[in-house]
Swiss-Prot record:
GO molecular function: rRNA binding; structural constituent of ribosome; tRNA binding
Cystine residue pairs: none
Alphabetical UniProt keywords: Repressor, Ribonucleoprotein, Ribosomal protein, RNA-binding, rRNA-binding, Translation regulation, tRNA-binding
Metal-binding among keywords: no
Stored Gene3D superfamilies: 3.30.190.20, 3.40.50.790
A biological process from GO: regulation of translation
Name listed for the protein in its UniProt record: Large ribosomal subunit protein uL1
Job description of the protein: Binds directly to 23S rRNA. The L1 stalk is quite mobile in the ribosome, and is involved in E site tRNA release. Protein L1 is also a translational repressor protein, it controls the translation of the L11 operon by binding to its mRNA.
């Protein structure tokens, strides 16, 4: 534990916590700090200019990251008939109806995301207390309740991430792994920021994107000058 602390302190000394770094410099620093023995995730925190206490200013959605997430995702789908076949063909590991619901109630949840066809919500709705706290409850706002289950499965497999503002008005998301090239991380971050811009509440006033900070799993936060992110 002491070694981790010393390593973190060494990297923290390299980062000016008050400085806004150009995106290329920020990514370079974050990747340098990601020196653990595993492939650390690269995470972003975005402070939004919204009042998270107001229901009309809750920012939520999803985006497919162009370079993927670097993570293998297991998908469960509630569907029947032709839609069930389409889900399987798209790569879903688990497809079912009442049988899948019973597995979930029994604690068998070997999946990372749940997708549901609208006609199955009578079944899925009974699982809210189980799936909700785990962040797995299907929701049309993030594209996991949809008649086009095949596309939803493909998106999940391709690197779709869901985002939702927390009580402090901050969005947290993973945009890749330390092993990713800087260009891949930048394209993923750009896609996320674009999705956040599109999700901006009409009632939000003033500066919307207030702060952007990058970090690795074991690293320190590096603030980003998002004007450099927009520059090509």
């Amino acid at each position: 534990m002491a070694k981790i602390s010393k390593r973190r302190q060494a990297f923290a000394a390299k980062v000016d916590r008050q400085k806004l770094y150009a995106i290329e410099d920020a990514l370079s620093l974050v990747k340098e700090c990601a020196s653990a023995k595993f492939d650390e995730s690269i995470d972003v925190a975005v402070q939004l200019g919204i009042d998270a206490k107001k229901s009309d200013q809750v920012v939520r959605g999803s985006v497919v990251l162009p370079a993927g997430t670097g993570k293998s995702v297991r998908v469960a789908v509630f569907a029947q008939g032709e839609k069930a076949e389409q889900a399987r063909a798209a790569g879903a590991e688990i497809v079912g109806m009442e049988d899948l619901a019973e597995q979930i109630k029994a604690g068998q949840m070997d999946f990372d995301i749940v997708i549901a066809s609208p006609d199955t919500m009578r079944i899925v709705g009974t699982l809210g207390q189980i799936l909700g706290p785990r962040g797995l409850m299907p929701n049309p706002k993030v594209g996991t309740v949809t008649p086009d289950v095949a596309t939803a499965v493909k998106n999940a497999k391709a690197g779709q991430v869901q985002f939702r503002v927390d009580k402090a008005g901050i969005i947290h998301a993973t945009i890749g792994r330390a092993s990713f090239e800087p260009t891949a991380l930048r394209s993923n971050l750009s896609a996320l920021i674009e999705a956040l811009q599109k999700a901006k509440p009409a009632t939000s006033k003033g500066v919307y994107l207030r702060k952007i900070a990058l970090s690795s799993t074991m690293g320190v936060g590096v603030r980003v000058d998002h004007a450099t992110l927009a520059a090509q």
